[in-house]
Amino acid sequence: MGTVTIQLSCLRHIRKLCFSCPWEGRRLFKMLLQFHHETQRPLDPGCLLPQDAERSADQPGRAVVDFPVAAVLPAGGSGERMGLTTPKQFCSIFNRPLISYTIQAFERLPWIVMVVVVVAKDNHDLMLNIVRKFNHTKVKVVHGGTTRHRSIYNGLQAFSDSTDSSTPKPKVVIIHDAVRPFVEEDLLLKITLAAKEQGASGAIRPLVSTVIATTSESYLDHSLERAKYRASEMPQGFLYDIIFQAYQRCSEFDLEFGTECLHLALQYCGTNARLIEGPPTLWKVTYKRDLAAAEAIIKETLSVSACIIAEAEEEAVELAKTLQKNLNMMETDVIPCGKESNVQYLSKTRNFIHISASASSSLWVLEMVKCFEDIDHARLYPVVIVWVQLSMTKQSADSQETDEFMALASEVKQRNVLLYGIKIDHSKELEQWQRSLERLGQITLVLIRDRNMALTGQMLHV
């Protein structure tokens, strides 16, 4: 394929590729903005990036978790409401199943010692492959039951086997849905400490709609006063002995038709749960539109920063500084070429912009990808490299060069690195040059934010 020219009017179209239709895209975007305004902070899908977990090491209260904590993730659902043949927990975002994101939200915390994932027997091998591929080191996979409560009970029983030293009994166990990947450490800490003190705890959210009861003839019977009620959410925490005993004592009817773990602890052990207000990001991926919203949140989180690498030419350095100003919506660092192999810079972000002002070898791309592999930087999330080539004189596209770039992009894509190219012609006309610089910033931002795999290997021309 030849050089692709992208007009400014196309940028909005590229940005919406993750949504099924423009109307739905606008609705989801408004929903994300609502999350942002309610929390009064940047959108945060549960500290998805590993460096966030490292920064959290100094958070107040961490030291008080001096007892073993484990998690049980029921993941045996069929995803009927999603309307897909693949269960929703195994639907992929960036070629990575949703359940892997949820597992990481727990694994990244050093005070969580074990994550038991409960899956249907038919999905056992699939889950084991996910654990191996994404290097989940704290996970034990067990078979689920025919209902949600039976699956949770199976997960809890994994800790009761005294002969299995690899799964020691925890003091506190957290039960969480496999399709709620956006759970933050702060909430998990509150749930854990409240469970240790009270015996049981759970996250709640305000009701967004009024709940009504209907008659058998489908007439209104009565409605509940919304202000008095809350929606029960996940995660929920328990002293292990309490919740395990509750499941041992509960009836077959509870196991078959029940859905609320807090109710079992209250009814069969007399333990009244402490309820904790959760953030708006606790929502559950249930429908196709939720999967699109989850992808949008992950993209937003991965796009907060970038590293601009400038080659030695004066023109490249100046272009790097200008691009940094135009990318003011992101945190950016400008470093000279040669330092990109420094782990300090590689581990800070998953977005890299390489600027050259003369014909240069593409070997640096392979060297950079090798560095990513050495620090396991691209296993969980795709890394973006935007190669900006500044031409001081207008040149026509070279088909051999274009083919080589596409082949290189295809090679590194197998290692979860997304390579894009942008050619920008320098103009002596100030107004035209300013327009080109503006388009360069806009296209670069879109490529980083959208992470569209279909555009890898394309050399865009501004």
UniProtKB/Swiss-Prot annotation:
InterPro entries: IspD/TarI, ISPD_C, ISPD_synthase_CS, Nucleotide-diphossugar_trans. Gene3D superfamilies: Spore Coat Polysaccharide Biosynthesis Protein SpsA, Chain A. One of its GO terms (molecular function) is protein homodimerization activity. Keywords: Cytoplasm, Nucleotidyltransferase, Transferase. Pathway: Protein modification; protein glycosylation. It comes from the Eukaryota. It catalyses: D-ribitol 5-phosphate + CTP + H(+) = CDP-L-ribitol + diphosphate; D-ribose 5-phosphate + CTP + H(+) = CDP-D-ribose + diphosphate; D-ribulose 5-phosphate + CTP + H(+) = CDP-D-ribulose + diphosphate. Transmembrane segments: none annotated. GO terms for biological process: brain morphogenesis; isoprenoid biosynthetic process; muscle cell development; protein O-linked mannosylation; regulation of protein glycosylation. The record marks 226, 284 as: Positions substrate for the nucleophilic attack. The record marks 81, 88 as: Transition state stabilizer. CDD domains: CDP-ME_synthetase. It is found in: Cytoplasm, Cytosol. One of its GO terms (cellular component) is cytosol. SUPFAM superfamilies: Nucleotide-diphospho-sugar transferases. Homodimer. Belongs to the IspD/TarI cytidylyltransferase family. IspD subfamily. Cytidylyltransferase required for protein O-linked mannosylation. Catalyzes the formation of CDP-ribitol nucleotide sugar from D-ribitol 5-phosphate. CDP-ribitol is a substrate of FKTN during the biosynthesis of the phosphorylated O-mannosyl trisaccharide (N-acetylgalactosamine-beta-3-N-acetylglucosamine-beta-4-(phosphate-6-)mannose), a carbohydrate structure present in alpha-dystroglycan (DAG1), which is required for binding laminin G-like domain-containing extracellular proteins with high affinity. This is D-ribitol-5-phosphate cytidylyltransferase. It comes from Danio rerio (Zebrafish).
